[in-house]
């Protein structure tokens, strides 16, 4: 968690900037597919700054360096950045955004450089306008300068084999999905859709890969028109069964040829437009609002391209019945694994007085999970955190630099797994000793927020932006809050963080209404820096519900929870719960016992633990 000395790396980067007449250089977190989680070879921001969090942007001028990140990572960034760096806390009053800070450095006609494959076209336009106001200019630098600094030490690009995702789990064939997409393209009168998001490609073709840790995706692009379906992928990644499965319905092309083909398509669209009557609007290619600037430029820019919220993202977010049933099933197995783990951990720490560190514990959890049906791997790096480490929202325990678990302190475990039938993400906060009154109060207020989301009933058209305050209301009444969203979309054996829906104050969460079939996390928290952290997280699925009345004749929605792991009885202060909330807790625990106790018929330790933790409060 401690800082590394970035002085030499920054010095070399500044030499390269000087050679290319670039005064300020931007290093985003994302890869060329705008992935949140990336392969090791794409960890450029981490390499140049030393900050390992999943979100952030580094900016380097000739004399300064800044790292911008959000509230999940303030503590972590403060610990990991050396004295070469300024921390820009996103969302803090009187703190500039990274775009504003960049523009300040560009005053007086300076040039700001960025790899155009690592920034979206819309972000590039907005940034260019911001920089222009200060007299600077934005330049797309085709050769990535951090890669040149990294040199031969940069990890190789992964090239793992791709596998079929069976129809029993996908619930819909890739032919049906492409047919649905073509209907959307027809509605928009578009020439085709150029797809760059990796999870969208995996979902569309019912394929899964292993190129990015914890995310079952593979490096590829795709172009879908009314008559063609082209998949751009290195062919050695495709076993014979995958090629046979795709058959003649999909043309395979080299991954590296996407930009040349995009240029040809763009030129063809332009020529066609020039030759047609001006009264008829030209057909444009659709790209996602999250597609790269370089892809937009290859297609000919705004005259040939329309940027839209991807229709695949919208379709993928509404799970079909097979996917929903898979989510229910995998969360029962995952809940059983977590109960076995927590029972084991308590026994080791309290009864056996075993000395365990945070990584020892998380390794055991992975071992337990791996025994369950359809297990593939973890869905993210487990957060196993004791005491003050639990206050670091996205804490990462390193094997050689982690804490011994203190049975007299709060223990927070945020973990998830990839199963063939679904993706899990569960957080539980426990205490193996005697919690303080403040710890119990904080836990119970967080629990009330979780229940408020879980039991919410709302009209069709309601967004996650509107629901976010439901989870915070009890903390707010005490003058408390948390610096992260309340929930994110979850993929079906895909990325654990999935758009476009979620619960929070992000602009995107105000743009898309929650719909039946959405799978979302419900994870309020509270963190006291240097002391303790609390988070409780369940996965919930949106569904239509019956109401006594139906104002406006709209459908009304609610949620179904699928996470099957007990809450920590010891941390609940029942006097802070209403009768309805107590009933919710008791009903939830009864459901957990009924669905998971069968796994422990020959495991007395876990069965006894589960029985105790699911007793009525």
UniProtKB/Swiss-Prot annotation:
Note on cofactor: Binds 2 manganese ions per subunit.
Annotated Mn(2+) 2 binding sites: 414, 425, 537
Keyword Protease: yes
Signal peptide interval: none
Keywords: Aminopeptidase, Hydrolase, Manganese, Metal-binding, Metalloprotease, Protease
The keyword Hydrolase is assigned to this record: yes
Assigned GO CC terms: cytoplasm
Cofactor entry: Mn(2+)
Protein EC: 3.4.11.9
UniProt GO MF annotations: metal ion binding; metalloaminopeptidase activity
Domain of life: Eukaryota
Catalytic activity, reaction form: Release of any N-terminal amino acid, including proline, that is linked to proline, even from a dipeptide or tripeptide
CDD domains reported in the protein's UniProt record: APP (cd01085)
Gene Ontology biological process terms from the UniProt entry: proteolysis
PROSITE patterns, per database record: PROLINE_PEPTIDASE (PS00491)
Binding-site residues, Mn(2+) 1: 425, 523, 537
InterPro entries: Creatin/AminoP/Spt16_N (IPR029149), Creatinase/aminopeptidase-like (IPR036005), Creatinase_N (IPR000587), Pept_M24 (IPR000994), Pept_M24B (IPR033740), Peptidase_M24_C (IPR032416), Peptidase_M24B_aminopep-P_CS (IPR001131), X-Pro_aminopeptidase_P (IPR050422)
Name used for this protein in its record: Probable Xaa-Pro aminopeptidase P
Organism: Ajellomyces capsulatus (strain G186AR / H82 / ATCC MYA-2454 / RMSCC 2432) (Darling's disease fungus)
């Amino acid at each position: 968690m401690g800082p590394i000395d970035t002085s030499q790396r920054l010095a070399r980067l500044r030499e390269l900037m000087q050679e290319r007449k670039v005064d300020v250089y931007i290093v985003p977190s994302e890869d060329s597919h705008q992935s949140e989680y990336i392969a090791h070879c794409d960890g450029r921001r981490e390499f140049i700054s030393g900050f390992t969090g999943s979100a952030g942007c580094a900016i380097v001028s000739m004399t300064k360096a800044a790292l911008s990140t959000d509230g999940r990572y303030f503590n972590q960034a403060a610990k990991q950045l050396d004295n070469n760096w300024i921390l820009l806390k996103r969302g803090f009053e009187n703190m500039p955004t990274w775009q504003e800070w960049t523009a300040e450095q560009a005053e007086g006609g300076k040039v700001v450089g960025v790899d155009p494959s690592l920034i979206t076209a819309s972000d590039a336009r907005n940034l260019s306008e911001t920089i222009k106001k200060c007299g600077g200019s934005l330049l797309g630098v085709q050769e990535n300068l951090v890669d040149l600094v990294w040199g031969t030490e940069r990890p190789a690009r992964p090239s793992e084999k791709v596998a079929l995702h069976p129809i029993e789990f996908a619930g819909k064939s890739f032919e049906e999905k492409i047919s649905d997409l073509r209907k959307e393209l027809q509605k928009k009168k578009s020439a085709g859709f150029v797809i760059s998001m990796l999870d969208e490609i995996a979902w569309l073709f019912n394929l899964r890969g292993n190129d990015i840790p914890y995310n079952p995706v593979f490096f590829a692009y795709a172009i879908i028109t009314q008559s063609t379906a082209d998949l751009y992928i290195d062919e050695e990644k495709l076993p014979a069964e995958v090629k046979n499965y795709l058959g003649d319905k999909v043309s395979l092309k080299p991954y590296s040829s996407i930009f040349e083909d995009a240029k040809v398509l763009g030129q063809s669209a332009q020529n066609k437009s020039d030759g047609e009557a001006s009264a008829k609007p030209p057909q444009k290619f659709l790209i996602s609002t999250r597609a790269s600037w370089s892809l937009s430029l290859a297609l000919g820019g705004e005259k040939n391209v329309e940027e839209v919220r991807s229709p695949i993202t919208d379709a993928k977010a509404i799970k079909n019945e097979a996917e929903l049933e898979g989510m229910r099933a995998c969360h029962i197995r995952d809940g059983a694994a977590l109960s076995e783990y927590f029972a084991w951990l308590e026994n080791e720490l309290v009864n056996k007085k075993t000395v365990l560190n945070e990584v020892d514990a998380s390794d055991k959890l992975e071992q337990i999970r791996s025994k369950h049906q359809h297990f593939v791997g973890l869905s993210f790096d487990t957060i196993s955190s004791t005491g003050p480490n639990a206050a670091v929202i996205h804490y990462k325990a390193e094997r050689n630099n982690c804490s011994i678990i203190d049975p007299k302190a709060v223990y927070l475990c945020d973990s998830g797994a990839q199963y063939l039938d679904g993706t899990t993400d569960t957080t539980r906060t426990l205490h193996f000793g005697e919690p303080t009154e403040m710890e119990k109060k904080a836990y119970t207020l967080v629990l009330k927020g979780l229940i408020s989301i879980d039991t919410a009933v709302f009209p069709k058209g309601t967004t996650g932006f509107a629901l976010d305050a439901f989870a915070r209301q009890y903390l707010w009444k005490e003058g408390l809050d948390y610096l992260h969203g309340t929930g994110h979309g979850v993929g079906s054996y895909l990325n654990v963080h999935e758009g476009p829906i979620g619960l929070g104050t992000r602009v995107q969460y105000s743009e898309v209404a929650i719909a039946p079939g959405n799978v979302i996390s419900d994870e309020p928290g509270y963190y006291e820096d240097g002391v303790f952290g609390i988070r409780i997280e369940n996965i919930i699925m949106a569904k239509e519900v019956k109401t006594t009345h139906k104002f406006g004749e709209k459908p009304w929605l609610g949620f179904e929870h699928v996470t099957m792991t007990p809450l920590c009885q010891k941390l609940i202060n029942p006097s802070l719960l209403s009768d309805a909330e107590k009933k919710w807790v008791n009903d939830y625990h009864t459901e957990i016992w009924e669905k998971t106790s069968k796994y422990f018929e020959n495991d007395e330790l876990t069965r006894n633990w589960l029985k105790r933790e699911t007793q009525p409060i």
